[in-house]
Amino acid sequence: MSKEKFYITTAIAYTSKKPHIGNTYEIVLTDAIARFNRFIGKDVFFLTGTDEHGQKIQEIAENEGITPKQHVDKIAGQIKDIADMLNISYDKFIRTTDDYHVKAVQQIFKKLYDQGDIYKSEYEGWYCTPCESFWTETQLVDGKCPDCGREVKKAKEEAYFFKMSKYQDKLMEYIESHPEFIQPES
């Protein structure tokens, strides 16, 4: 008889700046959940890792006079060292710059693009560079970023979008018939 599978992941830590207590807090809580589920007999797969792409990373690397890869190698190493020092029981530490990850994402993207699930368009809004977030006019607080309070700038960028509407009915049906699918319940 096969064990019930349980998949858990942290948000993958962003590598723009050195690790902080929030990274540690999240991974420790996730580790506790993974360990508990192993203890009760589930087949657990626990994923954590680092997100190593973004405008902020590029700007920081340029200011430091190094490549973005050199910058993220340093920060990702620190994040992994902390997880290992805390004896976190992850099964996989993924880095978005790992060759196998890049190739897998490219294959998935191409398949989705070829079947019409991804399309290119433009997005326009108020952009906060430190937060790497777009905001609408109504979300701004006194014309500033609602998260950090800094100035925002009007920006327009070409981007790829996923046609979620194509799958909405099936996804909603699945979530409603499998309430345990997304946890914790919001």
Per-segment meaning from a language model:
Residues 1-186:
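N-terminal, positively charged nucleic-acid-binding surface of large information/translation enzymes
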